[in-house]
Amino acid sequence: MTAVDTNVLVRIVVNDHPAQSARGAEFLRQQDRVFLAKTVLLEVEWILRSAYRLGRREILAILRGILAIGSAEVEDEAAVLQAMRWYEEGMDFADALHMASAGTQRFVTFDRALQERARRLGIAKIALL
């Protein structure tokens, strides 16, 4: 199994470099299994939001498309899916992924806004220091 870097996924979805987009897509089609680290998905969201100025709905559609790649094995997929649900409800994707990855562990922060967003979403495991 081969792990796929962020830039391969971004090139495929934004198609801003047609030759690399085509090579990346062809590579994925030829693979039985590829590994997608959750940190790669975190970077994909950040790049699409910050560099390409895509909105939350567009980013979620792209992330769902990436997760639907038949050959993809996603690291901690349950946490990624939970983070995507929280992101859809307005939480920052990085914060959501950090909290989802913590599982049932208590999550502490200095970020009052994060604590408030989590409280509104019914996430009780977050504590403000």
Predicted regions and their residues:
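Short loop/helix-cap segments at secondary-structure boundaries that form the rim of catalytic
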Residues: Q115-L121
